[in-house]
Design a protein with these regions (language model features):
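Membrane-embedded and interfacial regions of multi-pass energy-transducing membrane proteins
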Residues: 2-410
Length: 410
């Protein structure tokens, strides 16, 4: 038997010396710290996207303006669109879900913390690649780069490759976070907390995670095919070589339509909690609201071809997309009715969260009302790809992501 001394205590780091806070935050697997990273990053990229948007509006303010060159404008548009969706709206929703949902169900942490940490790291890497690409050769193909514009014959630089890599890393990170959060909500609920007892915001997180698990791999598959086309002589989207440029539109719009629905689900989940709290009464028809969130996820994703009514698709598919878009009115209307019914007769406390929530409902109603017009086939042929269509989308997204997000943050 050896008489050599054994250590009494093994410590992580030097005794009496605490690591800096930023190192603790960067290496932590705690869901609250990871949620803070997503939230702080999302708000930072919101500011950057607003600056880019302001510069583009200054260019468009005067006819024949030379403030921005056409190439610079296209690059800024591509960067602003990617920042708004991949670096602000979805991370803001996931950050609040990741921070609050485990606490709402009585869990001390998440089920797969390292997977969630990897997801956040992938998102940070994607954001770095996107803006590092802007320093060299940024993408010039727009918010949703459509084939065959993305082929090497039209854009021979590496801008589209950088965009595809950045958005792919972000999307993969979102999928990892969704798996971790969904596993937590499924397995780590407090004893006796059945699904019908789960808070509405935690239920919105569950629906959003399922939605991300559906739409995320679709975009990853599309980005993989795009990279094969550009770098390994693939023909997935190559027109005239047996490829189908329209395939990119289908795959990408499935993701973007699902993301649109995800942002609305996040906003309605947060607003439902806020309205109930600041009205001083339980949420009216709580089960109907929870069911409507599921319906928004399903119908909002199935309506992806509503963005393609000016593309060469069959008339039957156009009517299918129109019907899915019009059917979306039902769950959204039910949620509005129940939220208003909760406010009526309540002891309202007009604080910042409730004011943001009411502003979000107003903006969402205007945006979705305009989207109803754009979902009609006859009107879409005239209004699609115009500033009116862009305004309708931005009304709903600003109402959901910005006002709804600020309401939840308060």
């Amino acid at each position: 038997m050896s008489d050599s001394p054994r250590p009494e205590l093994v410590v992580d780091g030097l005794p009496g010396k605490k690591r800096p806070r930023w190192i603790e935050l960067a290496t932590s697997a705690d869901h609250k710290d990871l949620g803070r990273i997503l939230l702080c990053g999302a708000l930072g990229f919101l500011f950057i996207a607003l600056v880019e948007l302001l510069l583009m509006r200054l260019q468009l303010a005067i006819p024949e303006n030379t403030f921005l060159s056409p190439v610079t404008f296209n690059r800024m548009l591509s960067l602003c669109g990617a920042s708004a969706i991949f670096l602000f709206a979805i991370p803001l929703a996931l950050g609040l879900f990741y921070y609050l949902a485990p606490l709402q169900i009585g869990s001390r942490g998440t089920a797969l913390p390292r997977l969630g940490q990897t997801g956040v790291a992938l998102w940070v890497a994607g954001a770095t690649v996107l803006y590092a690409g802007y320093l060299f050769t940024p993408s010039e193909a727009g918010v949703n780069p459509l084939a065959p514009l993305t082929e090497l014959a039209f854009l021979a630089n590496n801008g589209v490759d950088a965009w595809a890599t950045a958005t792919g890393l972000c999307t993969l990170g979102f999928v990892f976070i969704a798996i971790d959060l969904l596993t937590t909500l499924r397995n780590l609920r407090a004893p006796g907390m059945a699904w019908r007892r789960v808070p509405v915001f935690a239920w919105a997180a569950t629906v959003s995670c399922w939605l991300l698990l559906v739409i995320g791999p679709v975009l990853l598959a599309a980005l993989t095919m795009l990279m094969i086309d550009r770098n390994y002589d693939g023909i997935f989207f190559a027109d005239g070589s047996g490829g189908a440029p329209l395939l990119w539109q289908h795959l990408s719009w499935i993701f973007y339509s699902g993301s649109y629905a995800l942002i609305l689900i996040f906003a309605f989940g947060a607003i439902a909690e806020i309205v109930s709290s600041f009205a001083g009464k339980p949420l009216f028809n709580r089960g109907v609201v929870m069911g409507s969130l599921v319906a928004i996820a399903v119908l909002g994703t199935l309506a992806w071809m509503q963005n393609m009514l000016t593309a060469p698709i069959g008339l039957g598919w156009m009517y299918f997309a129109m019907l899915m878009s019009l059917a979306l009115i039902v769950p959204v209307g039910l949620i509005f009715f129940n939220l208003i019914s909760t406010l009526v007769g309540g002891a309202l406390r007009m604080r910042a969260p409730l004011l943001f929530a009411v502003g979000a409902l107003s903006a969402i109603s205007i945006g979705l009302g305009a989207e109803i017009c754009h979902s009609m086939v006859a009107a879409a042929w005239e209004l699609k790809n115009t500033t009116d269509s862009t305004a309708a989308t931005h009304f709903a997204l600003v109402g959901g992501a910005v006002f709804g997000g600020f309401a939840a943050l308060h």
